Amino acid sequence: FGQSEEWNFQNSLDWHLLDYAPHKGIQEVIKALNEFYRSEPALYENQFVPDGFEWIDYNDGENSVISFIRKGNEPKDNLIIVCNLTPIPRENYRVGLPKKGILKEVFNSDKKKFYGSGKYINKSIKTTEHKWHSRNYSTIIDIPPLAMVAFKYST
């Protein structure tokens, strides 16, 4: 919940901070991330093997954006994850993708309930046959500032 004081084992946690929206938002995003982790096989099935992770792009230092794929045992469980590590929104950002299809946003840390703006929500997104990041397909997404978005291919 965003404890603002250093932890002290002799005192209780500052639970009263949950009365403030930013602190409540931190609690909600951590709760949602835990639920997301438990519900998405790609996040836990192959977490200790190299085949469970594949970089899409780790070289975009200019925009401070990283993107990667987390892989489950079944290709339908794979997740495309994109992180914007700056306070600047990245609108119309192109991401290389492994295959053709429609992507559905399955997690966005910028939702209003997380004390985010709620402005940069990606609906269903079609891939195009446009080479990017050494891949045959790509799409354009909006990435909120200081946020992580995750996508899955629709079946």
Language-model features, listed with the residues they occupy:
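Carbohydrate-interacting/catalytic domains
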Residues: 1-155
